[in-house]
Amino acid sequence: VAPLRGGYAFQSNQYANEGIPIVRISNILSDGSVGGEFVFHNELKDDEIFMLENGDIVLAMSGATTGKVSILSSEKSCKYYQNQRVGLFSKTATCNYSFVATIVRSEKFLEQLRDVLVAGAQPNVSAKDIDAFDFSVPKDVEEQSQIGNFFRTLDRLITLYQKKIDSSKEMKKILLKNMLI
């Protein structure tokens, strides 16, 4: 669907207290976002080959969270560095990026991922494995865009309703606690 680009092997002894945040596997969160505690690196020259930007789709390629997909979205920084074993789904002219986000969160993607993961001490997946996955993709980029936007809207609605459900549960808990005093 979109070629997967690997990251850069930053050395931990070169981390800084501030600078460009590095997206590591631990920053790819299960809720589909990128966050948590970042480490930083001083800005490097010619960093385009491992730079990430808001809206980029990343994939954990090693460890217990292999296959976890997140979308980089932050107001704090407009530039991030991509650590080794964090894959970036590259943007192409023939594939709408919203559609890519839908595909990589699909059951079909997860099925193919499970097929290539080798059981062992640490699961790993390669860019070559991911690039070989097979999907039915409309040739028309506008159609891809409509599909991607539809599912993005649906995901937002699900998130909104989940927040309302969580809020209602909390209110119920408080009311029951106060009622039984």
Residue ranges and their predicted role:
Residues 1-181:
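Feature detects amphipathic, helix-rich regulatory segments
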